[in-house]
Every structure is written in C-alpha cells, then in structure tokens.
Amino acid sequence: MVTGNVTGAASISERPARAMSFLPAGDFVVADLEYTTWPGAMVRGWSDPGEFREIVQIGAVRVAHGDSLCETDALSFLVRPTLNPVLSDYFMALTGITSDDVAEHGTTLESALQDFVAFTDGLPVLTHGGDDRVIVAECARKSLTNPMDETTWQDIRPPFEAYTGRKMMSSDLPAHFGLPDQGRSHDALADSRALLRVLAHLQEAGKLAS
C-alpha cells in the first residue's frame, strides 16, 4: 500500500517467453488491504513507537477462472483502527480515506474479517504482498481468533518480481504492462481490480497458467 515507481511500460512481447504458473485451477479471490502508515514507516518496518499496521480497508473480487478471468462479485468496506483511531495525514493523502470516513462508515476488525471469510467461501485468495500476514498480526495483537486460519493464501508478488525484474505495487502493474489506468491507486478494491486486469491480460496473452 506504499508508493512505488514505474520506470516505463512494457508490452507483453517485450517480456520473457516463459509463462508464469501460479493461478489456482478453479475460481479464486483477489484481495488487497490498506493499513495505517506514516512517512518512512515501510522503510523502518513500522518499528517506531505507536506504529502498527492496522487494517483500515479490505477490498476483494471473486474471480471465475475459465478460458478468461472474469469478476463475479466484489466487496469493499472500511475498518475502524483502535490503536491509532486518528489517521495520519500521510495515510489520508495516500488513500483518500479520512478519519471521518472510518468513524462514520467503518466496522470492527472482527466483523470485517467474518464478512471477508464469508465472501471468500473457501476459495483461495491471491494477494500482492502477503496481506495474510497483516491479518495474522492484527488478530494476535488484538486477541482475536483469526477466522481465516483455514484460508489458502498465495502471495503473487515474488513471481511478478522475478518475471518483471522490478519491485512494484499492484497498482503499478497495469501501467507496466501497457494497460490503461482505471481507478485510484491505494484503494483496496481498485487495487484488487487492477491486479485482476493484469492477470486476465497475461492469461489471454499466454503468459500465465495454472
């Protein structure tokens, strides 16, 4: 959820001939989280006093996996942080989410995770950056039972970094592969959809397989 740089778009024809192979055989979910952050927090690993990666937004799309990849359902909701209920100016500028937004429209982390696991309905969940580890840490920190303990998670950032030779955020990937920008970056649902567009593009081009 932190900013990254794109140094130029690359067409499919410019990528290596090999195909990535990580798609689940059946339907799956693509998900993204937005969590509290401050200037420099990522570099120092959220290690300053009072810095915690508290979930503020969950976004996800359910994907039908056939000859093409198609979105069949979506969710997006805000979560009220409790350790840092007042969001940093940095976070608000990055995401467009304000403290008033989460105070008025946010739900509890426990409720959000219950709704999220119901949405996934046993399907594997793909993330770009290991967001499951954020959920595990949040539940441990707040003494909550993790309802997604049995969920199959797959972090697809490593194969993308190996394929492109670059470290990028999920919101940067469409531009890298020459796809038009659609939606605000650092919005959990928009970033989930951005990642799905890239997956669908690569599958259609024969560069991505199960």
Which functions belong to the PLM regions below?
Residues S13-V29, L33-R133, M148, A175-P180:
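Conserved non-catalytic scaffold segment of RNase H-like nuclease domains
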Residues A31, Q154, A190:
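Active-site flanking residues adjacent to catalytic metal/cofactor-binding acidic residues
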Residues Y35-T37, P158, A194:
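Short, glycine/acidic-enriched loop or turn micro-motifs at the edges of active sites
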Residues R141-E150:
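A short alpha->loop->secondary-structure connector
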